[in-house]
Amino acid sequence: VVKSSYSLFSCVCWIGALALTARATELDDQFRTPPQNVTRVCVSLTVRRGAAETEWLERQLERARDIGAGGVLLSVPMTVDEAVWQGLERALERSRQLGLDVGLCDFCVAKEDADKVPRARKLVWSQETVQAVSSNTVETPPQVFTPPPSYRSVAHLAAPDGASDLQPHQLIDLSDTALPTNGAWRVFRFGSVELEPQRIDPFSETALFRHVNQWLFATQKRFARTYGSTLLWVHFSGHSQTEYAWPPDMPEAFLKRSGLNLFRHLPVLAGVPVGGGSTAAFVRQHAARTLRELWRDRCGKTVNELVHEAGLEAAIRIDEVPVEPVEVGRYFRRPILIASAKEEVRDSNRLAAGGARTLGRRFVMGWLAPFETEPSPAAVLLPFPWKHAVDRLLADGATRILLDVGGALSSDEAAFKQLRDGCLYAHRCQVMLQQGAPAGDLLVWSEKSLSSLAAYSYDAVNGTMLADASVREGRIRFASEREYAGLAVAAASLRHADDERMVRTLASRGVRVWLMAEDDASESTTVARFSGTANCVVLPANMRELPGLKPDCVWQSDAPGMQVRFMHRRTAAHEVYYLLNENAEPGSVTCTFRDTGKGAPERWDPTTGEIELLETDVRRDPDGRVTAKIFLGAHDACFVVFDR
C-alpha cells in the first residue's frame, strides 16, 4: 500500500512538473526562441511594373524570410494586367511555402476597368491679387503654376483686397460674372485634382462597393489556394493629413449639415475668415464633420461589410482618415500606427490603439521606416539604431511592426544585419504583446491621452463607439466581449447635450463615472453639472488616482528626465508588464505593480532573451501590490512578468 501511495504521489508530481514544463514551453521558451508564426514582423515591398513576372519578387520574399520577417505587404500598381495577376499568384504560393502571410496594398484595377473607377481627389486652391488698370483690362501677376490634367474647377471667386471683415455677400462668383474694374481684388481659384499615386475614391459609395466586391471576387478566384490562409489582409490608402479630401458631393452634403452655402465660404478653408472668426470656426468644424460622416457611411461601412465578411482583414494608416483615431479600428481591423518622436503623433497612436483594444482587435500595426528614422543620441549603445523607434510604437500600443524598407530589401550586409537584429528583437516583444488580453478595467473617453492617468492601463472610446455598448451589472460591455468597471470622461469630450445624456444614462445604470477637467473655467463648469449625480465623481484637475480604482503601475525615479511608459497584459498564467525608458539617459526606477499573481517578479530582456528573477529591493505590500527597483539603460525596454 505504501508503494502504491508513493507511486500515486510520484505520478501527481510528474503530472505537475509536466504542466509546469508545458507552461514554460508556452511562453518562456517562445520568448527565448520565438515561434515562426504571426508574432513575426511584416515587411512592405513595392512590386513595380514588370517585377512580378521576374524572379526578383521571389528573391525578395526569401530575403524577408531570412531577416526573420513573418509577413509581407505587397504594393502593386493601381492598374494591373494578366501578367501581374499571374506574378502575384506565384508570389502568394511562394509565400505559403516560406511561411509568410501576405497583405496586398489597395484594390488594384484591371486595365479594362481602369476608366470606370473614380479616383480619389483633393481640394487645391490659389490666391492672387489683381489690380484694375482700365475699364477693359486688369493687371495680373504671371502664372507660375499649371494645373495637372486631372484638374477640375470648383469655384472662381473674387473679394475686395484689404477688406478687414470679409463677408459672404462681398464675394463675387467669377464663373458667370466679369471681375469689377474698380480697385484691387483678391482672386481665389478652387479646384480638385487626383491624388498621386492614383487610388480609388473612398467617397464614391456605389463605385467603391462595386469595385471592392469585384476585387474580392477576383482574388478569391485567382488565389483559391492561398486566399484566407496566406493572403490575410488588404491595406487601403487614404488621404494624408496634408491633403484636403474632396468628395464629389461635398457642397451638397455640407449644406444639408450646416445650412450654409459652402461656395460662399470656401476661402475659410484657405485660411481667410469669411464672416468673422466665429463663422469661420463654424464652417471649419462642420466641413470636418461632413467629411467624417461621408467617410463613415461610404468608405468605413463598405470596407467593413465587404472585406471582413469575405474573410480578410483591412488596414489603414490612422493619419489617412478623417475620423478620430480612436474609432479607426471600428471599420479597419488592422489600424496602422505611425512611428514618430512627435508627441501629438504618439498621442494619436495611443488613442487608436486604445480604441482597437476596446474593439478586440488583435493586430495593431506599427509603420516604421527604419532607414529614415533619425537615431537618438544613445543609438551607439543600442543593438540596432532604430530600436527606440520600435519601442515607442510598442509602448503606444502596436502589437505587430510593419517595416517600410523603401520598396525592396537591400543586398547590403550591414543593412541585412540591422534588419535581422531588429526583427528578432521585435519578434520577442510581439510574442509577449500578443499574449492573452489587455489588462485594463478602465475605459477613457477623451480627445487626447490624459497624463493624469499615465499610471493606468486603459482602453479608449468615443461617443460613436459608446453608442454601440451595452451595460450589464454596472459594467460597460462591447460586442468584442471586452468589459469595463468604469468610465473616465474628459470634460472636453462633452461638447453636446447628447454626450452628456449618454454619460448620465450610463451612470443611472450603475456604471462608475469619473469626470475630469483641466484648469479651464468652461471645463470646470461642464463637470460641475454632474455634482451630486449618482455614480458620478467630479475630480480636481491633475488628480493622479481614481477613487476606488488602484493604478496598474506607479513609478518614481531620482534620475533626472526619467520618463517610463508601460503596457499591461494578462494571460491565464502570467501578468505581463512592458516597461520603456523614454529617456536617453540610464537610471533606476522604483515601480509598484498592482496585479502581481504569486508576487515573484521576473525581468525578461527582449534584446538577449534572458530571464532573471528580480530580488533586490523587492517587497510585497499587504494589499498584494509588489514594489521593485529596476535599472533601465538609455532607451531601455524590458518585460516584468509575474506568475499567476
How does the language model describe each region?
Residues V1-Y6:
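N-terminal secretory signal peptides that target proteins for export/translocation
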Residues L8-C11, F631:
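Generic short amphipathic/hydrophobic targeting helices enriched at N-termini
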Residues S10-A19:
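Bacterial N-terminal signal peptides
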Residues A22-A24:
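Boundary at the C-terminal end of the N-terminal hydrophobic targeting segment
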Residues E26-P35:
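Short N-terminal segments immediately surrounding and downstream of signal-peptide cleavage
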Residues N37-T39, V43-S44, A51-E58, G71-V76, ...:
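Carbohydrate-binding surfaces of carbohydrate-active enzymes
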Residues E62-D66, L394:
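Non-catalytic positions within long, well-ordered alpha-helices that form the structural scaffold/packing
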Residues L74-L174, A178-S192, P197-F209:
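Acidic/aromatic-lined carbohydrate-recognition and catalytic surfaces
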